[in-house]
UniProtKB/Swiss-Prot annotation:
CDD domains: FBPase. Homotetramer. It comes from Cupriavidus metallidurans (strain ATCC 43123 / DSM 2839 / NBRC 102507 / CH34). This is Fructose-1,6-bisphosphatase class 1 2. Its EC number is 3.1.3.11. It catalyses: beta-D-fructose 1,6-bisphosphate + H2O = beta-D-fructose 6-phosphate + phosphate.
Length: 365
């Protein structure tokens, strides 16, 4: 099927840059290199079990290690991280990088020029799904390097990356599913690009994506229900009560165990995703990482008319305190996220306004 009439990612970025005559084009070049890393990873993923990258990390010489998160690395975790580094370290646009798979920031080698941006990424989200052929993805966030880093050329430190999500200049993800799609914002709405395997180019297939304000779908890992805080229990119970409950309509519950897949579904047709703060592990008040998971998804949601929150405050307003900081995350259709925020704000005595939920949860503790 000829798709030559569709806009390429390169053309899209050029036309976006024209809105800012003073722009140098460095951001465009960086995004295109990120896209190249995603293309390379898409090719590896497409071979599935025909290749070596999807095998059990415990049996592979390049996998089976433990990353900074305390998670066992599969070969593709390691390979995807290496792809992102090699595709982006040389281009002269970056002052440094940070990844889920690396404990410390990655310093640009002295043999390459340094630039004015920072790249933060999760090279392979949903890697627990690799062996069962469920959609996985890559997430990235682009920040400006502090002025003194650019002026002096000094090595970046962890503190240079600790910027609130509102400071992002671009964010996106690539989902490796039946097709490979790159979803991107440069601060002027959200667009989706599908990888044409014949041309090897990302082509614009959706522009000005908007998240429906209302929904009848929610995504949460119900196995953690005994650890949820009362506002989250209340919200889920009300959804599960369906037409006979206070919401007066039926809801469907989803869970893919891949935040990229969940975010993509919500951007395309609405919904709300919850991986909230809970009491399961006091040392981890949230499961997802702020800088390279919550922040880029929050920027995409907000740019698409949705909302992203901890339940207590907007994600984009949170000031990070550590490179791998975890946080509770709720995002999706604006009306639903705001409802959950209201439940967090109401006094505890009002959290069980409906008698059905005053004494028990539909999820038994």
């Amino acid at each position: 099927m000829p798709l030559s009439h569709r806009q390429t990612l390169t053309r899209y970025l050029i036309e976006e840059r024209r809105r800012f005559p003073e722009a140098s084009g460095e951001l465009n070049a960086l995004i295109l290199d990120v896209a190249l890393a995603c293309k390379a990873l898409a090719r590896v993923v497409s071979f599935g079990e025909l290749g070596d990258a999807l095998s059990d990390g415990s049996a592979a010489p390049t996998g089976g290690g433990i990353n900074v998160q305390g998670e066992v690395q599969k070969p593709l975790d390691v390979q995807s991280n290496e792809m992102f580094i090699r595709m982006n370290e040389w281009n002269g646009q970056l002052a440094g990088m940070a990844s889920e798979e690396m404990e410390e920031p990655y310093l640009i080698p002295s043999s390459y020029p340094r630039g004015k941006y920072l790249l933060v990424f999760d090279p392979l989200d949903g890697s627990s799904n690799i062996d069962v052929n469920v959609s996985i993805g890559s997430i990235f966030s682009i920040l400006r390097a502090p002025a003194d880093v650019v002026a002096s050329g000094r090595d970046v430190t962890e503190a240079d990356f600790l910027q609130p999500g509102a400071a992002q200049v671009a964010a996106g993800y690539t989902i490796y599913g039946p097709t490979t799609q790159l979803v991107l914002t440069v601060g002027n709405g959200v667009a989706a690009f599908t990888l044409d395997p014949n041309l090897g180019e990302f082509l614009l297939t959706r522009s000005d994506i908007r998240v429906p304000e209302q929904t009848q779908e929610f995504a949460i890992n119900s196995s953690n229900s005994r650890f949820w805080e009362p506002p989250v229990k209340r919200y889920v119970d009300e959804c599960l009560a369906g037409k006979t409950g206070p919401r007066g309509k039926d809801f469907n519950m989803r869970w893919v165990a891949s935040m990229v897949a969940e975010a993509h579904r919500i951007l395309m047709r609405g919904g709300v995703f919850m991986y909230p703060r809970d009491t399961k592990d006091p040392a981890k008040p949230g499961r997802l990482r702020l800088l390279y998971e919550a922040n880029p998804v929050a920027m995409l949601m907000e740019q698409a008319g949705g909302r992203a929150s901890t339940g207590r405050e907007p994600i984009l307003g949170v000031s990070p305190t550590a490179l791998h900081q975890r946080i509770g995350l709720i995002f999706g259709s604006k009306d639903e996220v705001e409802r959950i925020e209201r439940y967090h704000q109401e006094p505890a005595s009002n959290e069980a306004a409906a008698p059905l939920f005053a004494e028990r949860s539909l999820f038994r503790d």
